[in-house]
C-alpha cells in the first residue's frame, strides 16, 4: 500500500538531464539567496529611514516650540516699546497740562 515514486534511473532521465536540473536548481538557489540578502539590506535601510524620520519629527517639534517662544518674546518687546512710548507721551502731556494750569 506504500506508493513510492520510482527511482530517477527508472524514469528514463539520463545523467545529463539530472546534472542540468541540478545546475538550474543551484542557480535558482543562488538567486534566492541573493534576493533574501537584498531584502535584508532593504529592511536595514528602511529601519534607518524610520529612525531618521523620527529624529526629524522630534527636531521639528523643538523648532516649533522655539519659534513660538521667540515670537512671544518679540511680541512682548514690541508691545512694551509701544506702551513705553505711550506712557512717556502721556506723562509729558499731563505734565504739560499741569504746568499750563500753574
Curated annotation (Swiss-Prot):
Record's Gene Ontology CC terms?
plasma membrane; SNARE complex
Q: Which UniProt keywords apply?
A: Coiled coil
Q: Which InterPro entries match?
A: Synaptobrevin-like (IPR001388), Synaptobrevin/VAMP (IPR016444), V_SNARE_CC (IPR042855)
Molecular function as annotated in GO = SNAP receptor activity; syntaxin binding
According to its UniProt entry, the protein's GO biological process terms are: vesicle fusion
Q: Which Pfam families match?
A: Synaptobrevin
Query: What name does the UniProt record give this protein?
Result: Synaptobrevin-like protein 5
What is the species listed in this Swiss-Prot or TrEMBL entry?
Answer: Caenorhabditis elegans
Gene name? Answer: snb-5
Amino acid at each position: 500500500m506504500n506508493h513510492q515514486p520510482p527511482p530517477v534511473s527508472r524514469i528514463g532521465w539520463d545523467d545529463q538531464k539530472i546534472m542540468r536540473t541540478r545546475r538550474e536548481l543551484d542557480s535558482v538557489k543562488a538567486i534566492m539567496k541573493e534576493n533574501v540578502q537584498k531584502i535584508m539590506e532593504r529592511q536595514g535601510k528602511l529601519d534607518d529611514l524610520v529612525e531618521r524620520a523620527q529624529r526629524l519629527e522630534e527636531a521639528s517639534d523643538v523648532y516649533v516650540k522655539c519659534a513660538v517662544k521667540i515670537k512671544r518674546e518679540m511680541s512682548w518687546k514690541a508691545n512694551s516699546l509701544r506702551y513705553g512710548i505711550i506712557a512717556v507721551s502721556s506723562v509729558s502731556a499731563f505734565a504739560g497740562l499741569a504746568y499750563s494750569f500753574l
